């Protein structure tokens, strides 16, 4: 049984949460997010808290309630503080630069890569080998970061590639004669 769903989500000052049937909207200083909550979960908003209760007699309702609680908590954190994901480019000649809403990447291919940034994600390059993605939607930030990393994942022999800032690449030893 999920214990995550038992903890309510606290609504901080400056954040407004509204429920319309099964659609939950969270508005804050950084923006607003909307999500449809599973029908196996009852949502109750009271005393600056959002509580999630499973519907009786539905299989997996506790799990759905825990998932809904985690998603709504991420929405509340996103609209109040925002999320940031950092990427590092490791390799000779690996570069990144921003051109409008596009991210131009030079990753050792014969051609430059252009990654279009979706609405809701902003990128900045403090240096040519660093990318900082920020926004209110945690899932979208992670998805964009994974797509960029997927162009050239870090390889285990030299460690070259695009990696998350906190990622530790396990290195392998080269084959010996």
From Swiss-Prot:
<keyword id="KW-0694">RNA-binding</keyword>
<comment type="subunit">
    <text>Part of the 50S ribosomal subunit.</text>
</comment>
<dbReference type="InterPro" id="IPR020040">
    <property type="entry name" value="Ribosomal_uL6_a/b-dom"/>
</dbReference>
<comment type="similarity">
    <text>Belongs to the universal ribosomal protein uL6 family.</text>
</comment>
<dbReference type="GO" id="GO:0002181">
    <property type="term" value="P:cytoplasmic translation"/>
</dbReference>
<dbReference type="GO" id="GO:0003735">
    <property type="term" value="F:structural constituent of ribosome"/>
</dbReference>
<keyword id="KW-0687">Ribonucleoprotein</keyword>
<protein>
    <recommendedName>
        <fullName>Large ribosomal subunit protein uL6</fullName>
    </recommendedName>
</protein>
<keyword id="KW-0699">rRNA-binding</keyword>
<dbReference type="InterPro" id="IPR002358">
    <property type="entry name" value="Ribosomal_uL6_CS"/>
</dbReference>
<dbReference type="InterPro" id="IPR019906">
    <property type="entry name" value="Ribosomal_uL6_bac-type"/>
</dbReference>
<dbReference type="GO" id="GO:0022625">
    <property type="term" value="C:cytosolic large ribosomal subunit"/>
</dbReference>
<dbReference type="InterPro" id="IPR036789">
    <property type="entry name" value="Ribosomal_uL6-like_a/b-dom_sf"/>
</dbReference>
<dbReference type="Pfam" id="PF00347">
    <property type="entry name" value="Ribosomal_L6"/>
</dbReference>
<keyword id="KW-0689">Ribosomal protein</keyword>
<dbReference type="GO" id="GO:0019843">
    <property type="term" value="F:rRNA binding"/>
</dbReference>
<dbReference type="InterPro" id="IPR000702">
    <property type="entry name" value="Ribosomal_uL6-like"/>
</dbReference>
<comment type="function">
    <text>This protein binds to the 23S rRNA, and is important in its secondary structure. It is located near the subunit interface in the base of the L7/L12 stalk, and near the tRNA binding site of the peptidyltransferase center.</text>
</comment>
């Amino acid at each position: 049984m999920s214990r995550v769903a038992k903890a309510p989500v606290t609504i901080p000052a400056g954040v407004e949460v509204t429920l319309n049937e099964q659609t939950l909207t969270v508005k804050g200083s950084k923006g607003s997010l909307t999500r449809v909550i599973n029908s196996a979960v009852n949502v109750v908003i009271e005393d600056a808290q959002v509580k999630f209760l499973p519907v009786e007699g539905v299989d997996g309702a506790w799990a759905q309630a825990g998932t809904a609680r985690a998603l709504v908590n991420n929405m509340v954190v996103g609209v109040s503080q925002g999320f940031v994901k950092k990427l590092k480019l490791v390799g000779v000649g690996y570069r990144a630069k921003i051109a409008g809403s596009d991210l131009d990447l030079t990753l050792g291919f014969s051609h430059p890569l252009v990654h279009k940034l979706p609405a809701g994600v902003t990128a900045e390059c403090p240096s040519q080998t660093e990318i900082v993605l920020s926004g209110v939607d945690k899932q979208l930030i992670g998805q964009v970061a994974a797509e960029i990393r997927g162009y050239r994942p870090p390889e285990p022999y030299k460690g070259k590639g695009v990696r998350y800032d906190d990622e530790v690449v396990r290195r392998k030893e080269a084959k010996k004669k």
